[in-house]
Structure formats: C-alpha cells, structure tokens
Amino acid sequence: MDQKVRVRYAPSPTGFLHIGNAQSALFNYLFARHFDGTMVLRIEDTDTKRNVEDGEASQRENLHWLGIDWDEGPNKPNPKYAPYRQSERNKEGIYHKYIQELLDKGIAYKDYSTEEELAEMRERQKANNEPPHYDGRWYGKSEEEQKAAEAKGLKPTIRFHFPKDHDYEWDDIARGHVSFNSDNLGGDFIIEKSDGMPTYNFAVVVDDHTMDITHVLRGADHISNTPKQIAIYEALGWEHPTFCHIPLIFNPKTRKKLSKRDKDTLQFISEYKKHGYLHEAIFNFIAFLGWSPVGEREIYSKEELIKVYDPKRMSKAPAYFDQKKLDWMNAQYIKSMSIDELTDRTMELIKEGETEEAKRLQSIPEEQLTELLKKTIKVHQRDVNKLLEVIQYAWSYYTVLDQSFNYDLLKDNEDFANEDVLAVLKGLKAKLENGDDDLDYSQAIKEVGKDTGIKGRGLYFPLNLAFTGSTSAPQIYEIMDIYSRDTDIELLDRMIKAFEN
C-alpha cells in the first residue's frame, strides 16, 4: 500500500454485536493489521429512536472478547479526529457546515413535504407501476414558497439533488467495477432530517473524509448506498476511499440473508460466548465467511490470519453459515488446549452464570469445582464441541446419586446373563472396598475380567451402565475417578440390588 491505511468499524448502538457486524469488524481488523494500518472504532448513533442502552458497551466488550482491538475510538481518542460518536460530532457542527456548503452551491435544497404528501406520492407511483422515487417537488422552489411553508409550522428535511443521467462508478476490491446511473437511484435523497440530525449516507461521508479513512470494508447490503455517498464526495470535491463490499452471511436453510428471526442459528457473539465457544474458534470461523486463504487448511491462529490475509481473495458469493463446521472448528481448538486452560475458561463461564447450567454449579466450593472440571475435561476433551457440554457433564457427575438409571437395559437381556453381570459388579465392588487409596481403577477392571473370565461388552457394558446410566461411555475408569470411592461403591451396590431383586 502506497498510502497509510486507515479503516473503520462503525456500528450503530441499536443492538448487540451480531455475527454480521462481527464479520465486518473482523475483516477491517485483518486489513488494518496486515497492512500495518490504523483501526478506528466509530459509533454511528444518529438513529436516536433505535439506540439501545448498553448497545455501545456490548459492542466494545464483545469485540474485545473476540480478540479485535482498535487504535482510535471513543475510549482511545486522537485529538486530530475526535470525537468518535456521530451525536457528539453533530453537536460540534461538523456536519452542518458541509450541509450549508451544498445548500449554497444549489446541490442541496429544503423539502417541506409532509409525511401524508409523501405517502400519497408513493401510493400514486405504486398505482402507476412506477418504481418508488422522490419526484423533486421542492427542488428549485423560491424563498417565498419556503417561508410560506415555515409559516405553517413545517420543518424541512434537506435533500441532495442528483444530476440527470450521471454515472457513479468505483472499482470494488471484492466485486470489481461497479456502476450506477443517477436516474435509477430513487430520486433526490435526504441528507439532513427535520430534527437537524444528518442521515447515515451524509454523516458517513463527512466522517470518513475528515477522519482520513482510506478503505471502507462493509457488507454487500451497503452497495446501494455507495453511489449516493460517491455523489456527495463529488459534490464536495473530495476523493472517495477505496470500497470493499464483503459477502453477506446467508442461512443455508432459507438461502436468504441471516435474519434475527432465524431462531435455528445463534445470532449474537454474546450467545456464542455463553454457550462455551472459544473466541479463537469464532475468530477463525468468521474469517472464513466470505474469504479464504490459499490452500485447504482451515485452522489458523489470529496471528497467522493477519499474515496471510489478502483482500483480493474475498468472495463475491454469499457466505453460508455452516453450524456443523463451527462446532467442528471449536472442537479442534478444545482438543488442542491444555486441561488447565480449559478449566480456567469453563470456570469463567460458570462465574458469569449466563446459563442455568452454569448457575447450578456455582453452589459447589471453588476448589471442589475446579477438581470436578479438570476430571470432566480429561474424560470428555476429545468428544465435546463446546464448553457448555463440559458444564452439563460436570453437573451430571456431581448429581449422579440423585439420578435414576434404567437397569432394564441389561436385566434379563439374552445377550447378558444376569449372573455374569452380577459377577462383574460384585467383583469390582470387592476390589474397591479392599483396595488402597491409590488403587488403579483401570487395572482393577482388568483383574475383574481375568477373575471372572468375562471380557469385552460383557465386562464393560454393566460397568458403563452402573456409573453413567448408559451402556455406551468413555473410559469408565476415568469416570470412576471423578466420583469419590464411596460414590463408586454405592453406584455398584444400587445395580447389584436391582439385579438381585
């Protein structure tokens, strides 16, 4: 890059960090870090009616959790570019002076149309099978007509006037050459609302220009905004930044843009966090939504992704959200981590108490809970997809004596003679009762098999059922180690009594 790269992630605080917003933030982050540039966090809060409490804080918190940091923003102001919230920038008059410049040039004008008049215009266009567009009714009106409207108490919006038959073009990093004609853009558009707040399309241009933004990476749903923004750049005599419109994330079931109404997919980064997805895995997964490096490899650390990132490998096609791929990827990260690291992260989830499963484990003393988690992870590290499953397993083991097992799975089963089942159970019970504190459970089970002459399914199915309630289980001696010796003996005794009765 010849110029010093400056990119921005500019969310609206109208909700929490959505997977689509996270994708946009992540690609801006990779771009900035790969090209040794500057990442700016800007808050676009002009839509005051839709802003939600803690929306901005949620954005920052979840970006940090993902591993995305920024160089400038509300909490890291550069005096040259601050402030970083559009509401604050509006109070300082940053936008209005450029609005006034366009008014003075005759490129912008005041529109006193009422909502009723605009609705009537749209209905008429619909009846005539015309595409919806503003008909320019207030363009070129005299000062007298404007004063007459104001005398009626009407407050104007300010519209940008498109020249006739003018092409707005740009070379998009992801999509190549893109062109729109001014006659097909819906007519003159509002750049300042009647309450004095600039609209998105105007504020974003002023902000990107005055903050020296060099590259704009954003979702493909913004493509229709880009010609309007280029029109403003041209009218103010400014050079526009380089655009890159990244693929939208689609639901593979509906084959449409992922919607907050799609209940089959977790929508917000905070939800992934509380379900026990690792931030490294989410970062890796999102990086592959609409982009891919050279080769077949899929597991990359953040540092590796920064190194190999090439924006020219951005896809034009939608990115389909593959839940199975995410679960697989998260499982790979779980398998690669140490038991101590996974224990610490699972403990964090429990302390945060964002799920009912996590809240239940908060009643266990921390030292005891830590030991329970370590042993649970040792057993299940190879077969869980997310840490919430570790929490669920841990609770199941902690409350094992409160559960009822269905011993009929083996009782009077023609494949398992009752006397053989009892021989296995009683044999292991005796070894537990008579063994030392450091008894090797794996060796004890082997000795029971040798003593009884029972092996394979005949040996392990009864023990699996006794200790887990299922004939299928991981290494049973590791599960026995999760319980106390007394609990192991009681679980064996319960099944023995069930078979003897």
Swiss-Prot record:
ATP binds at K260. Its main location: cytoplasm. Transmembrane segments: none annotated. It is found in: Cytoplasm. A motif ('KMSKS' region) lies at residues 257-261. PROSITE patterns: AA_TRNA_LIGASE_I. It catalyses: tRNA(Glu) + L-glutamate + ATP = L-glutamyl-tRNA(Glu) + AMP + diphosphate. GO terms for biological process: glutamyl-tRNA aminoacylation. A motif ('HIGH' region) lies at residues 11-21. Belongs to the class-I aminoacyl-tRNA synthetase family. Glutamate--tRNA ligase type 1 subfamily. This is Glutamate--tRNA ligase. The gene is gltX.
